[in-house]
Swiss-Prot record:
Its EC number is 2.4.1.-. It comes from Oryza sativa subsp. indica (Rice). Substrate binds at residues 331, 333. GO terms for biological process: cell wall organization. GO terms for molecular function: glycosyltransferase activity. Keywords: Cell wall biogenesis/degradation, Glycosyltransferase, Golgi apparatus, Membrane, Transferase, Transmembrane, Transmembrane helix. It comes from the Eukaryota. GO terms for cellular component: Golgi membrane. This is Probable xyloglucan glycosyltransferase 2. The gene is CSLC2.
Amino acid sequence: MAPPGVGVGVAYLWGKGRGGRKGTPVVVTMESPNYSVVEVDGPDAEAELRTAAVAMDKGGGRGRSRSRTARQLTWVLLLRARRAAGRLASFAAAAARRFRRSPADAADELGRGRGRLMYGFIRGFLALSLLALAVELAAYWNGWRLRRPELHVPEAVEIEGWAHSAYISWMSFRADYIRRPIEFLSKACILLFVIQSMDRLVLCLGCFWIKLRKIKPRIEGDPFREGSGYQHPMVLVQIPMCNEKEVYEQSISAACQLDWPREKFLIQVLDDSSDESIQLLIKAEVSKWSHQGVNIVYRHRVLRTGYKAGNLKSAMSCDYVKDYEFVAIFDADFQPTPDFLKKTIPHFEGNPELGLVQARWSFVNKDENLLTRLQNINLCFHFEVEQQVNGVFLNFFGFNGTAGVWRIQALEESGGWLERTTVEDMDIAVRAHLNGWKFIFLNDVKVLCELPESYEAYRKQQHRWHSGPMHLFWLCLPDILTAKISSWKKANLILLFFLLRKLILPFYSFTLFCVILPLTMFVPEAELPVWVICYVPVCMSFLNILPSPRSFPFIVPYLLFENTMSVTKFNAMVSGLFKLGSSYEWIVTKKSGRSSESDLSTAVERDTKDLTLPRLQKQISESELIDLKMQKERQEKAPLGAKKANKIYKKELALSLLLLTAATRSLLSAQGIHFYFLLFQGVSFLFVGLDLIGEQID
């Protein structure tokens, strides 16, 4: 960098040479990301620099000014040369990227183009629907409307002019050419709908059988009674986190209070935070518990690649991991009870084929708003029915990524954590299953966590959960076909686990209720039966709500919201199926930091008071302590009532207008059930499109 005096002179001369024109600073960035040249050309900075230059001229004399002018001209030439070199380098880099694009860049660009393509398709569909509605309204007011079952072509004497003739020609065209492909597609979607409904019914019957026979994994005797001689195995506890300042404290606190001999377990806080202030806060929390005698270490990666999988993979590469037999994983918002290890670890005893013990999630904010209530319905069914049934009858299910205990040997023999997808939990579960390891699910062991309270956070979470599996399917398919497991297990993995529950469900849900149904309103010759629109979906929603009976009043909002979410899930499924850019994205779900107990804030405040200043000074540096104080002051000065803004979702709004348009058309045909379904579904899309469901984003 140039000396301060030289920089002042350059700015002053540069401003004079340009006639005092105001502008914005010009930043020339070279190929090295750590080197940049900033040329000041802004109104405020220029005035300050001119004042400084005048002051220097008054104190330096004429001779010194001449020598300084020569140096200034030299620096001006150097700056211009560097700027030209930077532009040349940028041009060369852009040209190189154009001819040497990485697959990820190409996929990302394709993903953005696909998103625009889908939105364009919805807009085009909406425009055609509005045009068709205008035609139908004109026909209705002129008395040309023909009822669906009795469609016929009028005789020549009945035609009342060229407009009526054109309308009759349109009716004949749609009956002869448009009706057949719509009927074929609708029948295919109805078939998929029936298959998926049967799968859900079988799962519910399996859950009923488990409840009736009281089937569940059990521990023989009480291994922790006095005099039992139980040898506590070595357990590693991992807490991966990334910029989650709202929840880090309570998750670390809960892990440190696990009821297990302290010499027999170690806690790894795997911090991938990019915010240095959050890193300091987490370090201080780790230091506090370490001072209290807990075996806890703080790990931070310099190269944060691979998202959560890369974080876990890096932690498992430590030399001391070989001394541990099991690893328990908790995300940053999870709060295990003190007896968690005592309820899970004994299941491994005498069961060498057992690779995973998965606990159930419980939600501290399930009653916070309508969005969290609807999520609770979905996840209660997932754990109570899907995970429990698959665990009892198949000894296999998708690992939920947290609140589970792995046998480290199972992880290592299955290839460990891989960074190839954003669903590393499902990836390792499939590979472990192919290697012959068994899983059990403990429905009565619950770990507290949070649900996303804003639609934006929930939408991003669902996108990752539905794009990752389809991407993983292509990666695992060769291994599934060549694995040394039974044919029915291969069929279960391919047909049920991946295709039916990860691909078919979002496909038919979006296509049937958001495309075909409104389309049949304008092509009444291809009508959908009422049982597909109303009766079967209501029955399936009733089955979904059975595991959470208190949510029964929300059965209708749940049905409508699930159809609304089909847009996001279909979008994610397509991106994962074709390996587009958005299937590689990992966005940490926003947390609110809600506690599980009403007095948790009091307990945290009490612990904070115990963390005295001298104790902190022994464990973190003085500069870090100053940063912590400044961070606390900024939090205290922050406004309490931050203004929140609603985000507009264009796809949902466009689909809302489309469905409301189709509802208007169904009203002309006196289709009662079709009209009410389209009306309520359109209003549901409208609420979501205007971000009126859940907590608004800051």
